[in-house]
């Protein structure tokens, strides 16, 4: 494990030169050591803490004191908040429960939270599942990852497990490290050998623990075992160093060519030697640093040929292109819905499983997606940044504002595919579609029509005459709550539905829609008998009674029947009778009574 923070012996000339240049940025050797220590100390102290053994101390009090010290050095409560410390603990456990073949790959990305681990795994699974040619920058990484999952021997059969390879590497590492130090001293002098020794000494908080840690961090957790020098050192092999097949110092993967060795060392989890000058974040690969720096520079070199949108990374561009190709390779087994990204499918499947990972700290309500929690929190903060320019009403979500604006414009973007009926709100469309999608198993005993359960209850009020919704001002009652709401606007004077063309306002949305057809000239309701067209469905129904002879309105006094319940407008009466004022007044009074009830009022 010393190779984790030491300068590796098999680095090529360019890599060693890069480290030298990096070292010159610091004024003293102590500054350089401090920089290296800060980069790796948190992970080192975590491993010291987890693998600390009781046998290393003289008694329980010293053991407890040492554990507290190591935990303090790892979690750093003086600089981290409680939430950050909890996230570190969750992240550690998450990495621990991952399959061993995935741990090395995830740790190479150096995630700082559990969410970053999820993103790395989802991206990896998606890229490995994608058919065709992969991104060239990651091809070597994918091949290396597959090699780590199922390493093959000479005969093409699976070789020893990864854990066995690690154990073998542990026994071979002292000899190999000694030979690497000799090569390094020959090529570059003793400067880097001394630097490596200084860094190693600086990272030793307690004598025996460091030695134990360098021998094997992963195996020393089994407390009580003793590791004597003669037990961990093998006899030198008869073959020369040139005859040995090179292996990775981190996970023991065999490498056939020197070029593969160099590429693998760049991929394998190790030191983050590439640091960002702007924010100080470090990376293990230069390509990752280059892509990260575009956040500060604003550079977006990868441009979509279809829409011209630009991106910082090639992988993000590839994901974006799925929008144009329409490819949706990830399909839900429950409902058959397809998605362009695996992460989107994963989120969708929570609707079926009922998983809700995101909880509100204020009320405890849970959500399956982070966006849902984000919008919900605004209920508690009373944050309503989206304001309607027509009525100044504010909303917490832009989508709700867009739907609300349909009240003023009369727009109904949500249309039913079955019957063509349109709605302002998507929720109204969903409720309406239950009529088509749900089985109509509830039949009215009066007329034989079938409804859903809620629809039948509302329909039966027509036969029973029940009107549960009553106006508190005039005591008029209605079958539906929506009818009461529209009626109450007569008393309040509210006219929320305004015409954009002439400014005229209405109490009902349906009246506004019909009025707007005056400006557009639209007459969508056509009579099949004579071809006459009308702006509203009510006008068509009244007209069709001419052909059918239907007269549903009957006078209670004499029994005379009428086709419509029309009231003559006040303006029309006064204009027609301006020469005879008394007659106009009489007609005006009679107009207050429906046509089918005024036929017998001879006293007027």
UniProtKB/Swiss-Prot annotation:
- Keywords of the record: DNA-binding, Isopeptide bond, Metal-binding, Nucleus, Repeat, Transcription, Transcription regulation, Ubl conjugation, Zinc, Zinc-finger
Region annotated Disordered sits at: 204-267
Kindly give the CDD domains that the UniProt entry links to this protein.
SCAN
Residues in SCAN box domain copies: 46-128
Pfam families assigned: SCAN, zf-C2H2
Q: Where is the composition biased (Polar residues)?
A: 207-221
Site of covalent link Glycyl lysine isopeptide (Lys-Gly) (interchain with G-Cter in SUMO2): 20, 25, 196
- Where does each C2H2-type zinc finger lie? 274-296, 302-324, 330-352, 358-380, 386-408, 414-436, 442-463, 469-491, 497-519, 525-547, 553-578
Keyword Transcription regulation listed: yes
Choose one Gene Ontology CC annotation of this protein and give it: nucleus
* Coiled coil feature spans: none
The organism's place on the tree of life at top rank: Eukaryota
Q: Name one GO molecular function term.
A: RNA polymerase II cis-regulatory region sequence-specific DNA binding
User: Where is it located?
Assistant: Nucleus
Among InterPro entries, the record links this protein to: SCAN_dom, SCAN_sf, Znf_C2H2_sf, Znf_C2H2_type
- The answer to whether keyword Zinc applies is yes
What the entry lists under SUPFAM superfamilies is as follows: beta-beta-alpha zinc fingers, Retrovirus capsid dimerization domain-like
Q: What does this protein do?
A: May be involved in transcriptional regulation.
Q: Which family does it belong to?
A: Belongs to the krueppel C2H2-type zinc-finger protein family.
Q: Please identify the protein, giving its name as recorded.
A: Zinc finger and SCAN domain-containing protein 12
Species the sequence originates in: Macaca nemestrina
